[in-house]
Amino acid sequence: AIYETVKERYDLLGKQVIIFAGQGNNGGDGFVAARLFAEEVPVVVLFFGDVEKLSEEAELNYNKIKDTVPILDIRTKEDLANVHFQKRLKFIFIDALLGTGIKGDAKEPICYGIDLFNSEGAIKVAVDLPSGMDPDTGESGEKVCDFDMIVCFHDLKKGLEKFKDKTVVVGIGIPDSDV
C-alpha cells in the first residue's frame, strides 16, 4: 500500500528511496515497501533497532530483503557517521520507525532516526502516522518526524483528523468487524 500510494503521488524517476525502519510492525511495513520500491529505484534501509528484537511480522519481512536491499544497522550516534546523503540526489524518505503502539517520547536509537529524517531535504512520507506523534491526540512528542504525506492503514487515526488533507487512507484487507 505504501509503494502504490507513493508511486501514484510522486514521480519515482531519478529518486532514491530511504526507508527509516524500527523493529516493530511499522518497521515491517517499511521492509515490505523497500522490497517493492527496489524493483524500480535504488533503495537503502536505515534500521534503527536490534534485529534480535524484531516483531514477528518485521522479522519475516526483514529476512525477505536482507540479501537484496542494503540495510544499515544504527544503534548508536556513532553509527550515524556512516550515513551520508549525496546532495546531487533526490530522495524520498519513508518514516517506518514507530507505529500506533508506542506511547511517550521516542528513545534512542529512534530519536537519532527522527533527527536524521528531519535534517535532510526530501519528499517525506509517514507510514500510518508520523513517528513521535500520539495516534489518539495528534500531539507531538519531544521529537516527531516531518511529513508531506501520511499513508494511513485501514482508517484515519483519531489524532490525525487535523492532518486529513495530507493523509491518504488505504485498505489493507481488514474487515470493519475486526477493528
PLM segments and residue spans:
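Nucleotide and nucleotide-moiety/phosphate-recognizing core
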Residues: 3-97, 105-127
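YjeF_N-associated NAD(P)HX repair module
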Residues: 90-179
